[in-house]
């Protein structure tokens, strides 16, 4: 039987709010940078719209480097940068920095992959009608790739949620910190069970709602 006092319930509630805050803000900032980066990777690729081997190689190399670093290692490596950006390395706001840095390369590759799924005939038709690069990207490529981009956003959200829990090892706030401080160090199985249950519920909500949205906007 799970027994929790009022203080622990309040702590768990705060942890849920912090986790949602970290994931939500991280996703927004990640897509602000990751979406354009993915578009650039796509359009500068060999045989694409505006091929540029040097730009594509440099950006692709940087993306691959950051994608290859495990999150916990990246979290530690970015501690000085995190302190510089937000003034501290503890708490949910500080955790957003490494979450964004780790997720941007992931999103960039997701976006690049989604754009590659767009029918070449649609792109050729837009070019034949005199569309410029901005119109081609905003009116053709991104709208046509919306279903795939939505699925990618769901996958990214779940990934970021998992990473946010890992940040608990360094006092990153949210569910991870609660699980470490109360469930691991104090051997409180009740807290561990509830923490896992809440994370599972959040993941299921993201998955179900995200996939419904992707299906709704898929007009193919």
Segments from the language model and where they lie:
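Glycine-rich helix-loop "coupling/hinge" segments at transmembrane-helix boundaries
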Residues: 163-193, 197-198, 218
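Membrane-embedded alpha-helices of multi-pass transport/permease systems
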Residues: 32-37, 93-97, 101-123, 154, ...
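Cytoplasmic-entry segments and transmembrane alpha-helices of multi-pass inner-membrane transporters
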Residues: 40-77, 99, 104, 110-113
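Short helix-to-coil transition segments within interhelical loops
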Residues: 115-145, 185
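Transmembrane alpha-helices
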Residues: 133-166
């Amino acid at each position: 039987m799970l027994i929790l006092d009022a203080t622990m319930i309040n702590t768990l509630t705060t942890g849920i709010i912090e986790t949602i805050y970290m994931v939500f803000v991280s996703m927004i900032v990640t897509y602000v940078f990751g979406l354009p980066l993915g578009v650039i990777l796509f359009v500068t690729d060999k045989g694409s719209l505006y091929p540029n081997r040097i730009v594509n190689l440099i950006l692709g190399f940087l993306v691959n480097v950051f994608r290859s670093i495990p999150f916990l290692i990246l979290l530690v490596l970015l501690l000085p940068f995190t302190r510089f950006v937000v003034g501290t390395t503890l708490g949910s706001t500080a955790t957003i920095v490494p979450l964004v840095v780790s997720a941007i390369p992931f999103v960039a590759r997701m976006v690049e992959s989604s754009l590659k799924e767009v029918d070449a005939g649609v792109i050729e038709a837009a070019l034949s009608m005199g569309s410029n690069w901005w119109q081609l990207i905003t009116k053709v490529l991104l709208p046509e790739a919306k279903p795939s981009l939505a699925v990618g956003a769901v996958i990214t959200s779940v990934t970021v949620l998992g990473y946010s829990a890992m940040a608990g090892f360094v006092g990153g706030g949210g569910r991870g910190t609660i699980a470490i401080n109360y469930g691991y160090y104090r051997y409180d199985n009740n807290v561990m069970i509830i923490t896992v249950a809440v994370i599972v519920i959040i993941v299921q909500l993201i998955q179900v709602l995200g996939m419904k949205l992707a299906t709704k906007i898929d007009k193919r």
